[in-house]
Amino acid sequence: MSQTPSLAQLQPADAFLRRHLGPDPAEQQAMLAFLGVSTRAELIVQTVPPAIRLNRPLELPAALDEQAALARLRGYAGLNQRWTSLIGMGYYGTVTPSVILRNVLENPGWYTAYTPYQPEIAQGRLEALLNFQQLTIDLTGLDLASASLLDEATAAAEAMALARRVAKARSNRFFVDAHCHPQTVSVLRTRAEAFGFELVVDEPDNLAAHAVFGALLQYPDSRGEIRDLRPLIEALHGQQALACVASDLLALLLLTPPGELGADVVLGSAQRFGVPMGYGGPHAAFFATREGYKRAMPGRIIGVSRDARGNPALRMALQTREQHIRREKANSNICTAQVLLANIASLYAVYHGPQELKRIAQRVQRLTALLAAGLKSKGLRRLNRHFFDTLTYEVGERQAAILERARAARVNLRVVDDRRLALSLDETCDAATLATLFEIFLGAGHGLDVAHLDGGAVADGIPAVLQRTSAYLQHPVFNAHHSETEMLRYLRQLEGKDLALNQAMIPLGSCTMKLNASSEMIPITWPEFAELHPFVPREQAEGYRRMIDELEAWLRAITGFDAICMQPNSGAQGEYAGLLAIRRYHQSRGDSQRDICLIPASAHGTNPASAIMASMRVVIVECDPRGNVDLDDLRLKAAEAGDRLSCLMITYPSTHGVYEEGIGEICEVVHRHGGQVYMDGANLNAQVGLARPADIGADVSHMNLHKTFCIPHGGGGPGMGPIGVKRHLAPFVANHPVIRVEGPNPLNDAVSATPWGSASILPISWMYIAMMGPQLADASEVAILSANYLANRLDGAFPVLYRGRNERVAHECILDLRPLKAQTGITEEDVAKRLMDYGFHAPTMSFPVPGTLMVEPTESESKAELDRFVEAMLSIRAEIGKVESGAWPAEDNPLKRAPHTLADVTGIWQRPYEIAEAVTPSEHARAFKYWPAVNRVDNVYGDRNLFCACVPLDDYRE
């Protein structure tokens, strides 16, 4: 009788781990054998310097399977209380149309794509972003808009920085409307202090008393008041200062656009266009300005260019403004923005169209007017004369009773102070909401009837002089997709133009495009997480608190740091927040003169840009011929800095894809000269479970949760960049003016709009760590295995530029194409575009070394996919050989003409290579052909003929 397996034996082993890792055990053994080693442990010993090795398991709970992790997180979600939150302050209830929820937010074809640096395979989301810009331009009344910033508060800080760059006024003072949202004022204080600006927060009526280079006005303001800004804007222009206006997209459907009032910059949050509040984010900020300020504008701008056939094609325009090119001279350190959320907001506008959007705005405004009329009839004193959706009341001694009735009804109001209350209505409110509010403010037996009020004459709250008369959203895209069938097909059409992780490996170096597992994504749309206002009382967010506390504890265990600050909502924001903590630390010790930041020449562009934002002076440290930090140059630069040395920013493993043997000495040199070590966490995926930043010598580091910890890139955001700090820096990280966070100095101002940044995507990283547990080290090991496998397989055709100990690379490698360019004229761009014909997204081009490709396979790609990439690259090398031999002309070959489109093969073919060679160069391409939507995009034409709005594309055909 055969013995059947026991129940214990039938339990799934490493249930999630084996789903997350691409190569199975047999494939891993084959890869190890190719590298000449027997085990992963042997490879790690050869690769990771022994001085930094963490020779023990991570102190994390045992891994849960997917169902157990979801059940546990569901329990946390159930602890969050879903009250009706009318707190406002830039966050409002909204309805995400189901067709967008299911086909965009929950669709890996949208959320797993990368920032559209390769526009030929990103035309779908580029079109959605262009729609976002058109939406912003139309509603703000300005000439030019960007494709999103991180949140309203940081957008306001970017507006202040732009004003200083372009204003002719000589003042160093920036004025802030006292009735801006408090979180915005706090972020402005942080940025102004670092820049050395004087910030004046005062009543708008007092603006004339101040000489300024710019001002931020809120329209409608945080109290709900709507005032005519023209006199204030004229006064600002009279002293050659810029007028910046924070506004609300829904209100602008009914209000005169700020651009028509004379504003120079308009910004705000697009959250209420279909994006859940999510306890603070992620949300896309909009930002618009005048055409003349285009080169001073922060963030991504999508422009219309043309492709090699002369057809319209979209691309990211004016990239020379940005950190990845201009580094310390960049306008901003913005890298990751909020593309996925900007796309949701733009698609919300596409689906509803101008008439339905106006109806939604009118309904919100009508509800507010009825509430105002009812409370006025009962003698309540309203403090704002005009309004769109927000009312503020002086309630005096009645406040306690009102709040008690509100709690009984599970309604959150905004407590302004001990005598004033405010509330903001939104798309989710209805007549029943008003009935509840009448009872809350007036008690039982108030005698008001909503239907009766609605039948009478009620003032609408918007002054006649500020009622909108100009048209908006007239472009066909906003008037063609209003049935669900049409919208569904439009979304599919856009998605089909793009290449995302659900189709192929995206081997972008320094980007960690790993699996974003479905089980990790499921919780973000649970209403218990999605619907919470960021400023609800702590007890209503108990589930969030437990989840965040647990995630912070796990991140401490992984990194070795003593404290975590969750506020930064991108990696670049994390850099900025960490550098500010260092700056505050030095100031607390009387070392305010310490302002020099040492940065290796190989660093990410965000590093010098963030250092400049933190009021530091950047000094570059050279690298040696092997790509390591030149220790002699570091010692020299540190000694020269002396008591002005603030810190060193260093990425580990380095951006050259190696574990530097001297990292311990590097940290020691900086500490010996009184500096702090900031470790850029971009490459943390090669450290987890193998080494810890704090043990290596870092004092502070950010963690890209959208890289190492599985938050998807969303086509260019969202991201999260929490920072870990050692104990001595913990008091100096960001706090928040509305919800104080335990630990940091309560007087510290904020770096982002909400206390825990983009809190609603934190469940993704929680799920990943919960399901991996101590086996997170396996992910790091397989990432290193895959990178070395690729490096060694490709090295004969494309030399690997840098290697570390025992000729190993870390989790990524740099392929040197410069010799081929010199011999054949084929560039790294030609190879990148040709990979599209094989069905691949290109590796990172020309970073950190011009003329190279940086490849990072991650742990999630199977050996079959790695081999497919190798075969594509080797095939491309053979094609280059045909150019080299003269078989193909130097300027007319599949590489120079790549990528190839349907338009190429359906027209007259007059090229020295076959159609099959062009479009089906591999077996995979023959079986699963991905067609780029456009031919190679003309970047120069796009910048010289900048156009960043939706115009009928026929207008761009010559």
UniProtKB/Swiss-Prot annotation:
CDD domains, A to Z: GDC-P
Gene3D superfamilies (alphabetical): Aspartate Aminotransferase, domain 1, Type I PLP-dependent aspartate aminotransferase-like (Major domain)
Family annotation (Pfam families): GcvP2_C, GDC-P
Record EC number: 1.4.4.2
GO CC field: cytosol; glycine cleavage complex
Molecular-function GO terms, alphabetical: glycine binding; glycine dehydrogenase (decarboxylating) activity; pyridoxal phosphate binding
Cofactor: pyridoxal 5'-phosphate
EC top class, as a word: oxidoreductase
InterPro entries in alphabetical order: GcvP, GDC-P_C, GDC-P_N, GDC_P, PyrdxlP-dep_Trfase, PyrdxlP-dep_Trfase_major, PyrdxlP-dep_Trfase_small
Disulfide cysteine pairs (residue numbers): none
Record-stated family: Belongs to the GcvP family.
PANTHER family: GLYCINE DEHYDROGENASE (DECARBOXYLATING) (PTHR11773:SF13), GLYCINE DEHYDROGENASE, DECARBOXYLATING (PTHR11773)
Its biological purpose: The glycine cleavage system catalyzes the degradation of glycine. The P protein binds the alpha-amino group of glycine through its pyridoxal phosphate cofactor; CO(2) is released and the remaining methylamine moiety is then transferred to the lipoamide cofactor of the H protein.
Subunit structure: The glycine cleavage system is composed of four proteins: P, T, L and H.
Protein name, UniProt field: Glycine dehydrogenase (decarboxylating) 2
Organism per entry: Pseudomonas aeruginosa (strain ATCC 15692 / DSM 22644 / CIP 104116 / JCM 14847 / LMG 12228 / 1C / PRS 101 / PAO1)
Name of the gene this protein is made from: gcvP2
